[in-house]
Amino acid sequence: MQKKYYELFFIVEERYKNLFLDFAFDLGIEAIEEKDNGVYIRSHESLEELSWALEIFAQKLTTTFNLNHKIISNLSLVEKENKDWIQEYKKGIKPILVDNVYIHTTWQEEKKNFINIKINPALAFGSGHHESTYSCVKFLQKFSKSKLRALDLGCGSGILGIIMAKFGCNVEICDTDELAIDSSLENARLNGVDFHKAWCGSIDKANGLYNLIVANIIADVILILEKDIKNHLEDNAILILSGILDKYSTRIKEKFQDLELIDEMQINEWCSFVYKNNKKG
């Protein structure tokens, strides 16, 4: 065991915390702990570049949300004597309960009488804590049915695809990041489910029509893919759109007004919409 390790600490506004956690995971950081109203990141490698990247990320979010104050503070990087910080990190990750779905890590116990979703957060994609993922999990429990042909568009860690598979859907997944596909396939293996098809790319590579499509991606990408998404919807299909900041919700609704909006949810500034393909002509 190395004698020293690096510890990066910062405080971030609660409503933006998950964005920073996902950002760090996407950069391959595995040891992250939430504690004392702040976030600790630990590594044997120098974290100077990550510290700089977090500051740049915070500046971009400040611009995106039109804020007039900093959303990250007390950013500090120190060198410390080594300890078993991997175990400390594991203690900091909390499982998630969304109605009948229980999302937990590979080292946490399953919950009896619930649909258990096991996720390895070390695979560098989301572990289900983000508001938009939470909304999708709630909606999928309502609209996932056995033998539906389903697509997880922009699958990330594969959580949503795994949930649909647990409900008996014939699931396909896609993502523009090959690492996301690998992560999803590994998490599917951990959960004892299979995806009927998986590819690196977007919905333009899909064949045929779907009864259920979930797209937990940012609004700009949804707007770009609007026509492709609609062209792959079966009659009366369900479309779940999530990952949408509230300031973009009007634009999304305008683009999808030819479909029937049957449900919606907003948690903090994150919006999710459920449409049914009853086209208005």
UniProtKB/Swiss-Prot annotation:
<feature type="binding site">
    <location>
        <position position="133"/>
    </location>
    <ligand>
        <name>S-adenosyl-L-methionine</name>
    </ligand>
</feature>
<comment type="function">
    <text>Methylates ribosomal protein L11.</text>
</comment>
<feature type="binding site">
    <location>
        <position position="154"/>
    </location>
    <ligand>
        <name>S-adenosyl-L-methionine</name>
    </ligand>
</feature>
<dbReference type="InterPro" id="IPR004498">
    <property type="entry name" value="Ribosomal_PrmA_MeTrfase"/>
</dbReference>
<keyword id="KW-0963">Cytoplasm</keyword>
<dbReference type="GO" id="GO:0016279">
    <property type="term" value="F:protein-lysine N-methyltransferase activity"/>
</dbReference>
<feature type="binding site">
    <location>
        <position position="175"/>
    </location>
    <ligand>
        <name>S-adenosyl-L-methionine</name>
    </ligand>
</feature>
<feature type="binding site">
    <location>
        <position position="216"/>
    </location>
    <ligand>
        <name>S-adenosyl-L-methionine</name>
    </ligand>
</feature>
<dbReference type="GO" id="GO:0032259">
    <property type="term" value="P:methylation"/>
</dbReference>
<dbReference type="InterPro" id="IPR050078">
    <property type="entry name" value="Ribosomal_L11_MeTrfase_PrmA"/>
</dbReference>
<keyword id="KW-0949">S-adenosyl-L-methionine</keyword>
<keyword id="KW-0489">Methyltransferase</keyword>
<keyword id="KW-0808">Transferase</keyword>
<comment type="similarity">
    <text>Belongs to the methyltransferase superfamily. PrmA family.</text>
</comment>
<dbReference type="Pfam" id="PF06325">
    <property type="entry name" value="PrmA"/>
</dbReference>
<dbReference type="GO" id="GO:0005737">
    <property type="term" value="C:cytoplasm"/>
</dbReference>
<dbReference type="InterPro" id="IPR029063">
    <property type="entry name" value="SAM-dependent_MTases_sf"/>
</dbReference>
<protein>
    <recommendedName>
        <fullName>Ribosomal protein L11 methyltransferase</fullName>
        <ecNumber>2.1.1.-</ecNumber>
    </recommendedName>
</protein>
